[in-house]
Amino acid sequence: MPSHIARLLRRALGAALVPAISSILWVTAAAAHADYPVDYNFFSGIPYELRNPGGSLPGADDWSCRPSDAHPEPVVLVHGTGGGAQTNWGVYAPLLANEGYCVYSLTYGAYDLPWPLSAIGGMRPIEDSSAQLAAFVDRVLAATSAAKVDLIAHSQGNLVGNYFVKRLGGSDKVDKFVAIAAPWLGTFGPVIDPARDFARRLGAGPAFDATLGASPCAACAQMTGSADFIRSLNADGVYDPEVTYTNIETRYDELVVPYTVALVPGPKTTNIVVQDGCAADYSEHAGIAGSDRAAAFALNALDPDDPQPVPCHFIPPITG
């Protein structure tokens, strides 16, 4: 074959291969970064737990994930009372992964019992759960080589996260803390605190506290009103001065009562009530962790330099 014809063939072949290879690479990259389905429903994670007990949600717990320059901190999800790694975060794990975050979720505070009881987290004392979170964060930092993580927590998970931050060395490991329905000052204080004070005046304070703590949920008593745990954790202020907090709360919270205990002012703290500017949002304690409106506020708290529109439409209670 003449050399000039061979050169023409090589050029033609190269011209054909470049777009073909580019197409293959594009398809491969698209598959690697394919969007995970996001079902805005607080209970959307439960089917994953039923199908794969103790597993991970789509987009979560990829230990080979490396944070990008746009999102340098991995996000750790900290569930609420009775929740778990999958059951609490059916919305947030795939949503964050789609946004390009490395996202991780654990089940803390569960009893060492067979499934499905092993999937019910947030039962043990908060101090024990915080130690589990501390170990998990260390694992995330080691795997991703990140300097810090961001936390998104729901309900009791906020106290677990804050105890880690303030008492277990987490201040140097957490950058942003997004707190959904956080019982910072204890819950049901107006109801429980007068009864607790009366019992203490009668010398029955320990018996009163023991009665509150008699349920399988040891953490539940720690979150009530001015319980010893709450008073001790907040003795030096609610927040850690090195961490940026965003509180997201609903006026219809039936478990964090009054809802204003989730909105404590602070120097590096932003307080958001989801009904402000959107009267159609009827989410309550569970639904707020399933709604797209609250999720948009959370995304903007993680990345305030690239804010996304926050939707406003009818959001039902319970599911969000």
Language model: regions and residue ranges:
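Second-shell loop/turn segments in exported
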Residues: G80-G83, L117-R124, A218-A219, Y282-I288
